[in-house]
């Protein structure tokens, strides 16, 4: 119990630090996301809600003020967990502990290291957990949840958009050029050049989105905007959660569209550009259910 509780508390402390330094409100109690931490033998549930406690036999193991950590038998048989979870299916209203209520599921550092090469350092594991924690934070905002449901993202998985990127030359060429405009704007210091880069990005994106609506699916555009906002901001949190920060030159997967799922990279770059331009977006993005490329 001691090791698991210590690691959970370290994650919560890091979350508070990132909230203070990078994203105000991330640790606000009204957006609290219950955490389920998996070991090889049991689960630790951090501030679970009543539906979870009614569904699984739980024993209170640790309490410190408002923080309560319970243990339960392992709640599923999956080998690895590192994701936010929320059910939006009305059929789950009476049965799912996460019905319209985001949770974070994460495996212990030991399980994570076994399943994901390159994650042996606990510090790297913490950045992964913070990334997923931020997804729960997003879905705890009613306006963002409404935007997600209205966008078509629930019908079109991000893998389908990545498939379009890999399959259609016009799609990939435009996405890569859009990202090149963002990266150039991040490098430049001349305001006029930055403005031209932003205009170039918007023109290319508008043309691609129009073609997506004609040739693919109208819902694909809304889904892309939601995933870009969701994953770009979570990658931004992960970036800032890394001790000392990631070396961008050595970690080009963070910002290149041809290495990771492209929405992660473009979203991450838009967030960094908004920071550079001094745009007040963090207090509005999820409260108002906005998309990054509309700011």
Predicted regions and their residues:
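Pan-zinc metallopeptidase signature
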Residues: 2-21, 203-295
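Mature extracytoplasmic/lumenal regions of exported proteins
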Residues: 122-123, 137, 144
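Active-site recognition of the HExxH zinc-binding catalytic motif
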Residues: 127-140
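Short, well-ordered loop/turn and helix-capping segments at boundaries between secondary-structure elements
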Residues: 139, 143, 276-279
């Amino acid at each position: 119990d001691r090791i698991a509780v210590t690691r959970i508390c370290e994650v919560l402390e890091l979350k508070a630090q990132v909230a203070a330094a990078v994203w105000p409100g991330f640790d606000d109690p009204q957006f609290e996301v219950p955490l389920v931490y998996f070991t090889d033998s049991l689960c630790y549930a951090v501030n679970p809600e009543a539906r979870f406690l009614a569904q699984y036999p739980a024993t209170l193991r640790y309490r410190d003020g408002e923080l309560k950590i319970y243990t339960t038998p392992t709640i599923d048989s999956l080998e690895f967990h590192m994701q936010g979870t929320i059910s939006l299916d009305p059929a789950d209203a009476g049965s799912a502990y996460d019905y319209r209520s985001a949770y974070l599921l994460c495996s212990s550092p030991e399980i994570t290291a076994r399943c994901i090469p390159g994650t042996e350092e606990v510090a790297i594991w913490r950045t992964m957990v913070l990334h997923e924690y931020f997804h729960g934070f997003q879905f705890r905002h009613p306006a963002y949840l409404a935007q997600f449901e209205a966008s078509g993202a629930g019908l079109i998985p991000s893998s389908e958009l990545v498939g379009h990127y890999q399959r259609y030359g016009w799609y990939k060429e435009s996405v890569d050029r859009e990202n090149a405009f963002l990266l150039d704007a991040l490098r430049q210091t001349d305001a006029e050049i930055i403005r031209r880069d932003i205009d170039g990005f918007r023109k290319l994106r508008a043309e691609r989105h129009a073609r997506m609506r004609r040739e693919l699916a109208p819902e694909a555009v809304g889904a892309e905007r939601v995933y870009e906002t969701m994953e770009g901001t979570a990658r931004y949190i992960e970036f800032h959660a890394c001790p000392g920060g990631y070396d961008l030159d050595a970690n080009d997967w963070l910002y290149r569209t041809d290495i990771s799922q492209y929405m992660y990279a473009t979203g991450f770059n838009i967030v960094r550009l908004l920071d550079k331009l001094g745009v007040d977006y963090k207090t509005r993005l999820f409260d108002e259910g906005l998309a990054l490329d509309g700011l």
